[in-house]
Amino acid sequence: VYLNGNKSFMTNAVNSKYMLCVARNAADDPSLRENRSKFSMWWVPLRDDEGNLTPGISMEPLEKIGWNMGNTCELHMEDVVLEEKDLVGVEGNGFMQAMVNFEVERLIACAQSLGAAECAFEDATHYATQRVQFGKPIGKNQLIQEHITEMYMKIENMRNWVYKTAWKIDNGEPVQIDSAVAKLYCGRAAFEVCDTALQVMGGIGYTK
């Protein structure tokens, strides 16, 4: 089996030894190439034990304006040799297998959003107790207290969505809807919490 094509936005590719790739048979009728049943999932070795890239694979790191704790790359594959045993699951079922994986990945994204919101909340509340204006900490002002309350409320809602969805996954319950709604809410709420934290901290919130 020879794998050809490109894979964009692969997280931590620089540090990964393997990747999962969903691909179709190049010999398929072009009119059927978008058919979901034509995609299969493959286990692709990225590098050997010495760290050398697999022949036929090259990668380019992408520069991002944020999320710099992990690298993101674009991969190029040209006649990468795979064996039949590298097929993951059932041939032609790769798309549906990926969709099932996405349910767990959505939960991971929710947990990341929750963590970012909690960090912003901690920084903002600490600053509100330390920054003194007109003889008292700004946290004594009702507007700041309202901001902190709103942030806390959203974080608790985010945490409940994460725990509820994780509990369902652990108990083998379907989470197609829960994981999608959780990702939507947690991503939106995390942005709102971080934005509010910036308002509480003022200009200092924009510094490193």
Name each region found by the language model:
Residues N35-S37, E60-I65, V88-Q97:
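Short intrinsically disordered coil segments
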Residues V1, E74-H76, V90-N93, M99-K208:
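Alpha-helical interface subdomain recognition
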Residues S8-V14, N68, V104-I108:
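Glycine-rich phosphate/pyrophosphate-binding beta-alpha loops
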Residues G51-P55, D86-E91:
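Cytochrome P450 core scaffold surrounding the K-helix E-X-X-R motif
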Residues N4-I57:
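A short core secondary-structure module
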Residues E50-V80:
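Flexible, small-/acidic-enriched active-site or ligand-binding loops
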Residues S16, F39, M59, T72, ...:
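Short coil/loop residues immediately preceding or within conserved phosphate-binding loops
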